[in-house]
């Protein structure tokens, strides 16, 4: 099991395990603490390019000030090459978006359509586009749609109700080593099949740096190595229960690819509970708003 599947196992469709949410609170009674509004909330939007001959497929500006440009013919979930999409931070100078490391972007509205003028190293490209209909604004949506910085992962492993491991770390290597030692100490270690997969996943990959959700239905996971970055789709399966569906295709969201979000003390908490026979693994990821 890869580390990405530990963080969002169903989201990435890398394993066919079943997960259950840990948040059973009444959403009407759960009060979200005030949280700072992302700097570019009013500018956030995704534009899909309508020119079939263009090399560009989509341009998105996120609430937290990141631009994501997807090239035509690229599969957003494919991270084997860093030329499939271009991403970085942006700022705004009057009506011009300054794209760090790339150039400038000017957006002009014309009726129901848009014209994007992209200036890259002095070369201008005119891109006709339509604006993606955003996920409706609401308390949970607006809270979620921002960039979150990974803080820590907490893993609890139980077998027949007995706690085998209970540990937390911001380091995947540290958590992997501690989990491996716990497995070795357990008298029925041969029964911990899924736990061993988790331990190997932690040993093979680092934790991500940040996770970004946008109103346009994009989620972006950034790693230290940009080639490991993930760019896919999300939407609410049930906004009242804060149940999120994930997919490599925006039309293929299902309850099999879902996780429940919880907001506590200005943090995003994502929890998964994997149960198979006598083995239970509870994984909780804590993220803070990225400044």
Walk through the language-model features, giving the residues of each.
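Lipid interaction determinants
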Residues: 24-85, 93-233, 237-291
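C-terminal motif of bacterial Sec signal peptides marking the signal peptidase cleavage site
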Residues: 17-21
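Positively charged n-region of N-terminal signal peptides that target proteins for export
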Residues: 1-5
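Sec-dependent N-terminal signal peptides
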Residues: 6-11
């Amino acid at each position: 099991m890869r580390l990405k599947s530990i963080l969002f196992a169903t989201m990435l469709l890398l394993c066919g395990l079943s997960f259950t949410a840990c948040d059973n609170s009444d959403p009407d009674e759960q009060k979200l603490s005030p949280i700072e509004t992302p700097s570019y909330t009013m500018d956030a939007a995704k534009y899909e390019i309508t020119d079939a001959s263009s090399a560009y497929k989509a341009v998105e500006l996120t609430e937290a000030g990141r631009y994501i440009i997807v090239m035509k013919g690229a599969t957003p979930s494919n991270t084997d090459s860093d030329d499939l999409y271009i991403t970085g931070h942006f700022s705004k100078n009057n009506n011009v978006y300054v794209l760090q490391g790339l150039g400038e972007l000017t957006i002009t509205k014309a009726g129901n359509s848009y014209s994007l003028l992209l200036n890259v190293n002095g070369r201008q490209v005119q891109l006709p586009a339509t604006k993606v209909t955003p996920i409706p604004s609401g308390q949970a949506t607006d809270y979620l749609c921002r960039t979150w910085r990974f803080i820590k992962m907490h893993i609890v492993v139980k077998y027949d109700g007995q706690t085998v491991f209970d540990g937390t770390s911001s380091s995947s290597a540290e958590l992997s080593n501690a989990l491996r030692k716990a497995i070795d100490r357990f008298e029925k270690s041969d029964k911990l099949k899924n736990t061993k997969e988790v331990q190997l996943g932690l040993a093979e990959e680092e934790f991500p740096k940040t996770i970004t959700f946008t109103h346009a239905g994009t989620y972006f996971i950034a790693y230290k190595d940009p080639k490991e970055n993930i760019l896919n789709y999300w939407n609410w399966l049930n906004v009242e229960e804060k149940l999120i569906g994930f997919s490599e295709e925006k039309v293929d969201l299902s309850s099999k690819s879902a996780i429940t979000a919880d907001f506590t003390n200005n943090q995003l908490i994502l929890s998964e509970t994997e149960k198979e026979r006598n083995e239970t693994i509870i994984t909780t990821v804590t993220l803070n708003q990225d400044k």
